[in-house]
């Protein structure tokens, strides 16, 4: 019997890097509302008392960058100097330019179907049947802990909570099946006037216990709640934040490979984002069809070229049919050209700010989480 531990982490919407991601995607959403053909690559940097929004944007839309940035920061919960960051009074700097015409000529085509990829690169998608959302369990529960932290904070259930937080979940596996939770780490920013006993008890009762499956917890499970003993200075006062620095948190928590490209602030012509979503969609439908228990897809593209330069499938010995057959089914049922996958997943819509915290995958509201091709795939593979 093989036994091993596997760990994934998540961060809250108030983590500095996630503040940056949410600002970048809020800018993208507002532009897409006005200009579906916009080209957007928006980057954000946050530090004590300031937010810098930059990048390359070509659009007919007009967006009040300063007001939108302040709104996002305040919505997260940073709206008073006592917390260390105040969306009402922080400086907002705008350093946005236009996308290079050299890139435009490779992407834009007379026929939309011939639209080229916005850059070269490799993208991965993954699915596993170990959770109901066909995502790895460790990252799924790490995200849910962070969502619960925000819910408890915003409802005032624990009024000493502050926006910045991190979680980490270590699962124990035997023969590739989860048998329990070995360790939980949860660090949360808090007010200066609360003692650590109160923090520990509050986090256990209001955040950890309502989220983690009771059958996975035991007297051997280890809990590390604010293990440094104090977490008052947080958010951009504690660390600077930058768009695109939480790419493993955004995807599969280390359970699958990553092509290296970040998502937030990029319009769907950037295959770093859109093709990673498409790869997840393909992998999830393969697992939902029962063609594999685990499935990882790799796609690759060349800048200015519509067709993917490669498609790879890995099922880790769990496939019910050959990987080569799965590649053929992918080519038959999924249009993975940039314009094709944008249409297939209806990506030209202002949905991206909500992706920028708690993971881009495993959340039913997003179109790449549909399993509407599973029955077709199953039938085509001749599985009864």
Curated annotation (Swiss-Prot):
Coiled coil: none annotated. Keywords: ATP-binding, Cytoplasm, Magnesium, Metal-binding, Nucleotide-binding, One-carbon metabolism, Potassium, Transferase. One of its GO terms (cellular component) is cytoplasm. It holds the Pfam family S-AdoMet_synt_M. Residues 99-109 are annotated as: Flexible loop. Signal peptide: none annotated. It is found in: Cytoplasm. K(+) binds at residue 43. The keyword Transferase applies. Its EC number is 2.5.1.6. Its main location: cytoplasm. GO terms for biological process: one-carbon metabolic process; S-adenosylmethionine biosynthetic process. Binds 2 divalent ions per subunit. L-methionine binds at residues 56, 99, 239, 270. Mg(2+) binds at residue 17. Belongs to the AdoMet synthase family. Catalyzes the formation of S-adenosylmethionine (AdoMet) from methionine and ATP. The overall synthetic reaction is composed of two sequential steps, AdoMet formation and the subsequent tripolyphosphate hydrolysis which occurs prior to release of AdoMet from the enzyme. Homotetramer; dimer of dimers. This is S-adenosylmethionine synthase.
